[in-house]
Amino acid sequence: MIRTEHLSKRYESVTAVDDVSFEVRPGEVLGFLGPNGAGKTTTMRMLAGFVTPTAGKASICGHDVETEPLAAKERLGYLPEGAPSYGEMRVRRFLEFICDLRRLEGARRSARLDYVIEHLQLASVLEQSIETLSKGFRRRVGLAQAIIHDPPVLILDEPTDGLDPNQKFEVRALINEMARDKIIIISTHILEEVDAVCNRAIIIARGRIVADDTPLKLAARSRYYNAVSLQLERPDQLAAARAAVAALPSVADVEVSERDVRLTALPRSGAAILTAVAELASSKGLVLKELHLESGRLDEVFRSITA
């Protein structure tokens, strides 16, 4: 388990992290979200033992990060911001160096090297120096060093930063695979990543936790939760459709996009309006291209509570 208790970090007059407490248990993939400067990276550095807290404490698998640093770090895989490494080293030598530091030997060493090379698709760059790699490959090398010793806890700061869409998909699949028996914290500003791999999300703003829930429940706070979107075949029906939908008692507002010939009905207090809107469309003879029920928009919730 990862545990933080009243964790704070101050730099003279600036409070970067302010009284943060949470726990993460095995099987949880926690998305750590926040705007730039919110305190995400500072919190992760304190968890990883790279920054000393001003107050409070953090532990990894029961080992205090300050008083038992080696025991805590043995159980931790950490991908820092920017994926720093030794640029002059070849990729193969760097991974072997990490194996030495992690005291991996014999068959287990070979197996773990093979695992990270295969799953992060590093075979083609093993003999290149790290400084010559693209940003995406450097990120994958950084992730490889974090997981090579198969730790029970992973702390990953922007793990898909710099990756192309195919590489992002592969790394997210790997995270989902590892999530079965590990504790994983992912710091990200990519909200689609939270939907793709996380079963819990914490939002931090101005150094404090402002939300802690599942992505689905956070999205349900959105005014678009249970909203119904209709795309019409005929632009000439748009104005009448808007007026008819707006007159429904359970509809709070209607947004219109003339370019897409689309209207979105927003419910009052998250009410279920799909049936009423669908029946109205049928009774009014609206010719539809699409009828879509929204589950909420995490980006809108994020903006509303961090602004």
Region roles according to the model:
Residues 171-266:
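ABC transporter nucleotide-binding domain
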Residues 2-4, 9-205, 209-211:
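ABC transporter nucleotide-binding domains
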Residues 268-307:
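C-terminal coupling/interaction segments
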Residues 9, 22, 230-232, 263-265, ...:
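Preference for bulky hydrophobic residues occupying beta-strand positions
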